Design a protein with these regions (language model features):
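Exported/periplasmic cell-wall-interacting domains
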Residues: 60-160
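Gly/Pro-biased beta-strand-loop elements
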Residues: 1-103
Length: 160
């Protein structure tokens, strides 16, 4: 494995490293992120450990449960740029935007990146950062399953 993403939940930062042909690790990028906070209901702490990136996609859709005619269903309520799956239900993605947001919700969320734990499990990034990471993870990958890209080079995510 030559590609690593290390996420520090205490400092709300992330470092991306790649081993070169001389077996030296180089810092590719270092940035602020927002990780998950457990609220006991529907929000969870970002899982700690080592994970292999399973797949990526160009966007992340968010849903909310609604009850219609006594039946529970999921309705798409927002999206975010990029989606990198690193654990069961845990993703790295851009700033989430509600489909009904007519105010400054996106700017408020963006202003909190790197400050404190706030997401529902995922790792939030600035949009330009997640775009860069998505290209770096996928590099020349051509394996597609629906709208998911399967990285050809393994990428390990370490959450501490």
């Amino acid at each position: 494995v030559n590609k690593f993403i290390i996420i520090d939940t205490e400092s709300q930062t992330e470092g991306i490293f790649e081993r070169d042909k001389k077996n030296k690790y180089k810092v590719i990028t270092y940035s602020f992120v927002t990780t998950g906070k457990d609220n006991g209901l529907f929000s969870y702490e970002t899982p700690k450990g080592m994970f292999l990136v399973a797949a990526t996609r160009p966007f992340m859709a968010f849903g909310k449960k609604i009850i219609e005619e006594e039946k529970e269903k999921i309705e798409i309520s927002g999206t975010a740029k990029g989606a990198i799956r690193f654990s069961g239900g845990g993703y790295m993605h851009g700033i989430p935007t509600s489909l009904k947001d007519e105010g400054n919700g996106r700017k408020v969320t963006e202003s909190k990146i790197g400050t404190f734990k706030e997401s529902h499990k995922c790792v939030r990034h600035f949009d330009d950062q997640i775009s860069f990471i998505l290209k770096w993870v996928n590099s020349d990958s051509k394996t597609m399953v629906r709208d998911y890209t399967i990285p050809e080079d393994p990428v390990v995510v370490i959450v501490i």
